[in-house]
């Protein structure tokens, strides 16, 4: 695989956002990260992202998330053909295939791209177009076929009545023979109503013989049943629909793997979360990042867990857990905030309206309600009761209670020895 070019230069004006459209998230990941992940599935020699609108934001994201990716700049948005030409500029002579895809098509998978390339090679096509059949093709370019071959692509606004009846649509995702792509792009004209250089014109050139490569055929199609893999995101409504569909698939997968989810429509699980058998999730649960939940644990209702570990048989109710470890059999909530660096050992209890931060709470220790415990070591068996503000060590069998004034004991005052 010679190269993958990801087009990510568009304005995204319909998002009405100061943030690049490509950085809006689906299932907790920027859309561009999904696109790059799919492209990596092809193991290309070159992976190029064409940037333009809000390029500084996109380049900053790539520097952190995908520093090995090459960027090319489309300073003026003159169409998809021009964007691909910008992507090719910095590449040496290419041999093999070039895949063109988009940064705002987050559900496209690496497996689909791999199969598409295989079909392209098997049929020795000049160009292979990723297509899908949809119920309502309004607004999409239509695939015109002559038998199995693609003889053209017509945009909806230019289609006649018969062509508009065609339900097979162009996704805009292609595999090109590298030589044919370079030649076709060099021949593009912007003599059209929009004054732009269209990548679809390269497809037309390959179909009518304007562009030829010895030993290669013309234009073929690879049609997929999963229409979602061809859908882009242009506004917040489409973004919400995409998030809902990705989440539906994730949630369905976990239920089939042995997780009880009381209300799948109000439970949100990001793709890197790992759940054991017999976990129960109640409504209003959000599981984010690299969270893991052990067998028999119960989470919810109304819980957010981010990059944390909830171990076997633990229970978390109406609370938030972030960058923390909740041990086996621990009970948390309701209305508690387990902040970064908190470790709750086996059978500990953190009850209502408790906040912990950077704290180790030992086995069977209890903070039943209304307390703050930060930067502390609460050893096994200790009890911290209502109104406590603890920021130092508390050792069993101590009980800390009723701290209501500035005259609290020095053992609880972190400033006392300073």
Swiss-Prot record:
Q: Which residues of this UniProt protein bind Mg(2+)?
A: 104, 234
Which EC numbers does the record give? 2.7.7.23, 2.3.1.157
Write out the ranges of the annotated region (Pyrophosphorylase).
Answer: 1-236
| Cofactor: how and how many bound | Binds 1 Mg(2+) ion per subunit.
Q: GO terms for biological process?
A: cell morphogenesis; cell wall organization; lipid A biosynthetic process; peptidoglycan biosynthetic process; regulation of cell shape; UDP-N-acetylglucosamine biosynthetic process
Q: Which InterPro entries match?
A: Bifunctional_GlmU, GlmU-like, MobA-like_NTP_Trfase, Nucleotide-diphossugar_trans, Trimer_LpxA-like_sf
Q: Which UniProt keywords apply?
A: Acyltransferase, Cell shape, Cell wall biogenesis/degradation, Cytoplasm, Magnesium, Metal-binding, Multifunctional enzyme, Nucleotidyltransferase, Peptidoglycan synthesis, Repeat, Transferase
- Show the Pfam families listed in the entry: NTP_transf_3 (PF12804)
The organism's superkingdom is given as: Bacteria
Q: Name one GO molecular function term.
A: glucosamine-1-phosphate N-acetyltransferase activity
Identify the cofactor(s).
Answer: Mg(2+)
* Main location as per UniProt: cytoplasm
The record's section on SUPFAM superfamilies has: Nucleotide-diphospho-sugar transferases, Trimeric LpxA-like enzymes
- The positions annotated for binding acetyl-CoA are 386
Q: What chemistry does it catalyse, as a reaction equation? A: alpha-D-glucosamine 1-phosphate + acetyl-CoA = N-acetyl-alpha-D-glucosamine 1-phosphate + CoA + H(+); N-acetyl-alpha-D-glucosamine 1-phosphate + UTP + H(+) = UDP-N-acetyl-alpha-D-glucosamine + diphosphate
Looking at the UniProt entry, the stretches that span the membrane are: none
Binding site residues for UDP-N-acetyl-alpha-D-glucosamine: 7-10, 21, 74, 79-80, 102-104, 141, 155, 170, 234, 339, 357, 372
Database matches in CDD domains: GT2_GlmU_N_bac
Query: Where does the protein end up?
Result: Cytoplasm
Pathways involved = Nucleotide-sugar biosynthesis; UDP-N-acetyl-alpha-D-glucosamine biosynthesis; N-acetyl-alpha-D-glucosamine 1-phosphate from alpha-D-glucosamine 6-phosphate (route II): step 2/2; Nucleotide-sugar biosynthesis; UDP-N-acetyl-alpha-D-glucosamine biosynthesis; UDP-N-acetyl-alpha-D-glucosamine from N-acetyl-alpha-D-glucosamine 1-phosphate: step 1/1; Bacterial outer membrane biogenesis; LPS lipid A biosynthesis
- What this chain does, per the record? Catalyzes the last two sequential reactions in the de novo biosynthetic pathway for UDP-N-acetylglucosamine (UDP-GlcNAc). The C-terminal domain catalyzes the transfer of acetyl group from acetyl coenzyme A to glucosamine-1-phosphate (GlcN-1-P) to produce N-acetylglucosamine-1-phosphate (GlcNAc-1-P), which is converted into UDP-GlcNAc by the transfer of uridine 5-monophosphate (from uridine 5-triphosphate), a reaction catalyzed by the N-terminal domain.
NCBIfam families linked to this entry: glmU
Question: How the protein assembles, per its UniProt entry?
Answer: Homotrimer.
* HAMAP family, sorted: GlmU
Family that this chain belongs to: In the N-terminal section; belongs to the N-acetylglucosamine-1-phosphate uridyltransferase family.
Q: State the name under which the record lists this protein.
A: Bifunctional protein GlmU
Per the UniProt record, the source organism is Cutibacterium acnes (strain DSM 16379 / KPA171202)
Q: What's the encoding gene here? A: glmU
């Amino acid at each position: 695989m010679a190269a993958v070019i990801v087009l990510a230069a568009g304005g995204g004006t319909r998002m009405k956002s100061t943030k690049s459209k490509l950085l809006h998230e689906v299932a907790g990941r920027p859309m561009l990260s999904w696109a790059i992940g799919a492209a990596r599935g092809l193991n290309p020699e070159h992976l190029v992202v064409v940037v333009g609108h809000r390029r500084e934001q996109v380049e900053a994201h790539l520097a952190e998330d995908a520093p090995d990716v090459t960027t090319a700049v489309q300073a003026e948005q003159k169409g998809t053909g021009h964007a691909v030409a910008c992507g090719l500029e910095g590449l040496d002579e290419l041999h093999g295939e070039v895949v063109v895809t988009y940064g705002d098509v987050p559900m496209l998978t690496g497996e689909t791209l791999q199969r598409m390339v295989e079909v392209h090679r098997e049929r020795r096509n000049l160009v292979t177009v990723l297509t899908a059949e949809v119920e309502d093709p309004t607004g999409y370019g239509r695939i015109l076929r002559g038998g199995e071959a693609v003889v053209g692509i017509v945009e909806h606004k230019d289609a006649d009545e018969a062509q508009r009846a065609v339900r097979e649509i162009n996704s805009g995702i292609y595999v090109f023979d590298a030589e044919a792509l370079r030649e076709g792009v060099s021949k593009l004209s912007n003599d059209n109503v929009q004054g732009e250089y269209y990548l679809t014109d390269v497809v037309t050139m390959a179909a009518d013989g304007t562009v030829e490569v010895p030993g290669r055929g013309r234009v073929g199609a690879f049609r997929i049943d999963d229409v979602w893999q061809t859908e882009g995101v242009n506004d917040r409504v489409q973004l919400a629909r995409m998030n809902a569909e990705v989440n539906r698939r994730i949630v369905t997968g976990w239920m089939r793997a042995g997780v009880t989810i009381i209300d799948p429509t109000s439970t949100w699980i990001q793709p890197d979360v790992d759940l054991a058998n017999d976990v129960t999730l109640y409504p209003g649960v959000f599981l984010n990042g690299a969270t893991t939940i052990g067998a028999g644990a119960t989470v919810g209702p109304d819980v957010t867990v981010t990059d944390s570990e909830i171990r076997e048989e633990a229970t978390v109710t109406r609370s938030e857990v972030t960058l923390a470890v909740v041990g086996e059999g621990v009970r948390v909530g309701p209305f508690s905030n387990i902040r970064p660096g908190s470790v709750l050992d086996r059978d500990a209890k953190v009850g209502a309206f408790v906040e912990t931060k950077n704290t180790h709470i030992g086995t069977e220790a209890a903070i039943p309600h209304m307390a703050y415990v930060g930067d502390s070591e609460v050893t096994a068996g200790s009890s911290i009761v209502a109104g406590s503000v603890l920021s130092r060590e508390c050792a069993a069998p101590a009980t800390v209670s009723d701290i209501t004034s500035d005259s609290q004991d020095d053992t609880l005052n972190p400033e006392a020895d300073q």
